Amino acid sequence: FTPWKYKAGMHFGWFQVTAFQHDKHVAAYGGGQTWTGPTLISSFPDKRYNATYLHQYYRADRTPPAGNIRNYPSAPWRGGMGSSHPYLFKWVEKDRTHSNQYNSQNVVAMRYAELLLMLAEISNELGNGQEMTFLTPVLTRAGLTPRAEYSQGQSSFRDAIMEEYQFELIGEGEDSFHNKRRGYQYFLDLSLIHISEPTRPT
């Protein structure tokens, strides 16, 4: 799942993360700042950011500065379908000299971080006071401290942990299980990102 011309060898297919999901992540952990442009984004406090999103690179078959590929948010104009959303970087072949069409990258079935998030969610629902014990290691690994929503009661924690699943596990195929557990109405109201600009590319 490597973007076009990101590596030397021919390849087919890649994933993109919607700009709206990207912006939701940035808003959650951006500290109230406006994070725009590649320079600011590269110093974003959430360490998961650069491991999750790819929005600017130079083609492997060109010598920089030629072949500069820019997607949102490095291309903030969002002028076309291809550049309107960042690529998902998790499954990209990181070796840019890789010349084969296929690689032997493992597919993750489940991660320890997901287990910790589930235990935090369960603890919150049980009201046993253990939720931060499980959540803190996930946030610490990402270089983060708990945001305010985690200390504003059970309902607020519930909504925040459902967002944390998205930020931590995006592109790993686990969304449907967590959405199903919460129910269809919760999915419609809080899990789906409501687009307020229907005329922009989606």
Predicted feature locations:
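Acidic/polar-rich alpha-helix caps and helix-coil junctions
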Residues: S43-S196, R200
